[in-house]
Amino acid sequence: MKRTVIMMLDSFGVGAAGDAAKFGDVGSDTFGHIAKACAEGKADTGRKGPLALPNLARLGLAHAAMESTGAFAPGFADNVDLIGAYGHAQELSSGKDTPSGHWEMAGVPVLFEWGYFSEHQNSFPKELTDKILARAGLDGFLGNCHASGTTILEELGEEHMRSGKPIFYTSADSVFQIACHEGTFGLENLYRLCEIAREELEPYNIGRVIARPFDGTGPSDFARTGNRKDYSLEPPAKTVLDKLKAAGGEVVSVGKIADIYAYCGITKKVKANGLEALFDATLAEVKSAGENTIVFTNFVDFDSHYGHRRDVAGYAKGLEYFDARLPEMLALLDEDDLLILTADHGCDPTWQGTDHTREYVPVLAYGAGLKAGSLGRRNSFADIGQSIASYFKLEPMEYGESFI
């Protein structure tokens, strides 16, 4: 029986990519810097000691990172009984954003330039916001800037609740984000507003509109809820997900995968929030998955909760939780199944600012007859999509080189 499980550790980079200088990210290293902080006792909040990832290490994580950076991360060495094939991949796409990374690994790199709102204040054109407000029947909005999602709630959350004005903000990514209180503004109203924004943003070539619902009574307890929703553009070509679906296969999205691909190539969507629930849902879907199925999960917390918030200890604790549960996944796999663990970009929690970092991503592959050992440096994330196409005996993708 042929099944593929893709576990996307959102933002888990393994060292600055070859073109990191273009992005101001030379020296970034999500995995390496987390390991270093843990080894130095600087990440002991909620956990303690060196970073412990024995199962990821057996799958080749430390070796992939060593080949990327030239040295083993602190606390890791070459004394592991490897069971997986490992490599690291350079992104071909022009950006270091979520859609670019996901689409490329499914065989469709983003070779065009996204639109961006580069001004840190007064970020959005008045013509754009006027159209959105008019269609939504709103008399104003807050924000209009680059901001951290948690900080902007502390600064503007109360005013939003008083005025009913939505909070519009952006970042270094190609994104338009809208934060609204679930209780006072309403979740469905927020979703409708995002749909309007998605339509009006078409001429600007913005990759995503993101609904950022939150709850709470004031700055001290405002918190995002699990009802985030991404409104992405469709990939510019058929991904390997589309091809498997067209061939009669199943593609199961766990978490935000369906949103990232604008539902293209998806046959089933499973909602889950948080590392534990996402892992539970992934296991449940693998248990019930039949022949010619992809189960694809995005573990977004690594990015949204720890990377962007520059929470090194939280990131380390999350990785250790994920690692501790990996044996449950391995126990479910048949001999012919293919497991792939990877990332879509970096988000070094020790780096300046709050944005993503341009890094190599790990490519860890297990099963399907693959021999343990190095896959080397992959020239594109699309090698993953090409390998999946080869595995399922689908028509080859235009980009990528199979490692199967």
Swiss-Prot record:
- Identify which cofactors the protein needs according to its UniProt entry: Mn(2+)
MF terms in GO: magnesium ion binding; manganese ion binding; phosphopentomutase activity
Q: Which reaction does it catalyse?
A: 2-deoxy-alpha-D-ribose 1-phosphate = 2-deoxy-D-ribose 5-phosphate; alpha-D-ribose 1-phosphate = D-ribose 5-phosphate
User: Which CDD domains does UniProt cross-reference here?
Assistant: PPM
Describe which pathway this protein belongs to, using the record's wording.
Carbohydrate degradation; 2-deoxy-D-ribose 1-phosphate degradation; D-glyceraldehyde 3-phosphate and acetaldehyde from 2-deoxy-alpha-D-ribose 1-phosphate: step 1/2
What Gene Ontology terms describe where this protein resides (cellular component)? Answer: cytosol
According to the record, cofactor stoichiometry and binding are noted as: Binds 2 manganese ions.
Pfam families in alphabetical order: Metalloenzyme
What EC designation does it have? 5.4.2.7
Gene Ontology biological process terms, A to Z = 2-deoxyribose 1-phosphate catabolic process; 5-phosphoribose 1-diphosphate biosynthetic process; metabolic compound salvage; nucleotide metabolic process
**Which key words tag this protein in UniProt?**
Cytoplasm, Isomerase, Manganese, Metal-binding
Q: Which family does it belong to?
A: Belongs to the phosphopentomutase family.
Which NCBIfam families does the annotation name?
deoB, PRK05362.1
Its name, as the record gives it, is: Phosphopentomutase
The protein's organism comes out as: Shewanella oneidensis (strain ATCC 700550 / JCM 31522 / CIP 106686 / LMG 19005 / NCIMB 14063 / MR-1)
